[in-house]
A protein has these predicted regions:
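A conserved acidic beta->alpha catalytic loop
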Residues: 35, 52-60, 99-101
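Acidic donor-binding/catalytic loop of UDP-sugar-dependent glycosyltransferases
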Residues: 58, 98-112, 182
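Glycine-rich, basic loop-to-helix element that forms the pyrophosphate-binding segment
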Residues: 72-88
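Short aromatic/hydrophobic "clamp" motif used to bind/position activated sugar donors
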Residues: 93
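Conserved donor NDP-sugar-binding/catalytic core segment of glycosyltransferases
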Residues: 104-132
Length: 243
């Protein structure tokens, strides 16, 4: 496991497998690989695994050595993440969205957090800042700090054995990251958070502040329905109507 360029030192004491689910990400995958090219993993063995869910836009052809490309097994994002985890060799699994921009020293911060706890995430900030997105950003970071609930766009890193002990991500069309965080809480495993933030795209939000607020509120309602017993399949149907 390699991929080392002496520009930024990771200083993470454990081997890390970065797992990135992709589906038609030709517009983002080059920029993410460029980020990895600039990182020196400082002797901590690291691998990057792209898990493709059937891209048709040329995403597969853009993956370059030494990064790995494998085909997804199972359905949904949870299936992609689990496929990557099973193929990974690292002591730490780092699940990352393809449109993410890591802060400087990201792997060093992963090591710092994992010296205190067994699972962690990054604080989040959006690439575009509007009043609604700033509110969403603040609430997301407070949710991790006080409720130990993290979502996929924040970048989750976890010790490999704990990931499998927690049951992996559920094979469901929606809420896989939310349910996994709940599983960790039941195991008594708090999610730590880095000092610096990961930057993520606001592309899941529509244009216009009113529409952004509507999506944010409706997503909170979907999570509330899930906690009360609604099935992920039922919520997935509703999800398409709230964006």
């Amino acid at each position: 496991m390699s991929a080392r360029v002496a520009v930024e030192s990771s200083q993470c004491p454990k081997s890390v497998s970065v797992i990135v689910p992709v589906f038609n990400e030709v517009s983002t995958i080059d920029a993410l690989q460029d980020q990895f090219d600039r990182i020196d993993f400082a002797g901590s063995r690291c691998e990057v695994i792209f898990v493709d869910g059937g891209s048709t836009d040329g995403t597969r052809d853009r993956v370059r050595a030494p990064y790995r490309l494998i085909d997804q097994e199972g359905r949904g994002r949870g299936g992609a993440l689990n496929t990557g985890a099973r193929a990974a060799e690292g002591e730490v699994l780092f699940f990352l969205h393809c449109d993410s921009v890591l802060p400087e020293g990201a792997f060093r911060e992963i090591g710092e957090v994992l010296s205190r706890t067994r699972v962690g995430t990054f604080g989040i900030r959006f690439s575009k800042l509007t009043p609604v997105l700033m509110l969403c950003q603040v609430m997301s970071n407070l949710r991790v700090r006080f409720r130990h609930i993290s979502y996929g766009d924040q970048g989750l890193f976890i010790e490999r054995d704990l990931f499998f002990k927690a049951g992996m991500f559920p094979d469901v069309p929606l809420m896989e990251d939310f349910q996994f965080a709940l599983n960790l809480k039941r195991l008594g495993e708090p999610i730590g958070m880095t000092r610096h933030r990961i930057r993520t795209s606001a592309r899941r939000f529509p244009n216009g502040e009113v529409d952004r607020l509507r999506v944010w509120v409706n997503m909170a309602r979907l999570r509330s329905r899930y906690v009360k017993g609604a099935s992920p399949e039922e919520l997935a149907l509703a999800y398409g109507n709230v964006r």
